[in-house]
């Protein structure tokens, strides 16, 4: 609906860039559309805390960028957002504080940027988010670690 209010499920779906016919059966939606629908329903209730489990799964790059912007806005407005994800690029784009787990054990915690910058394994993802050039240099990492 083009006249849907911004805080409604239809308005939130439009904000996420997802066009879903109201009469469509949710089982006929793509995985990304279903995830966007669930998120829109959750947000329309205006919860004080938002829990997201692998929220970028099934989303295309554009929808992921929209979700990143929405999560940042919600956090800036004071909403607590707890995210479980394997998407390092998304975590780097929205996270302030991160807990890293391996085999069910907490192995590190700290600011997202510090944790990601401290591991060479995350260099490709960090390059996508933070590096001004297509190549992440030692100087880029040194600047992040300061």
Model regions and ranges:
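Walker B catalytic motif
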Residues: 54-55
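Conserved ABC ATPase signature
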Residues: 25-29
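ABC-family nucleotide-binding domains
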Residues: 60
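A short, surface-exposed alpha-helical micro-motif characterized by mixed small hydrophobic
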Residues: 91-93
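ABC ATPase nucleotide-binding domains
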Residues: 122-146
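H-loop/switch region of ABC-family ATPase nucleotide-binding domains
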Residues: 85-86
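Conserved beta-strand-loop-alpha-helix hinge in the C-terminal portion
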Residues: 105-127
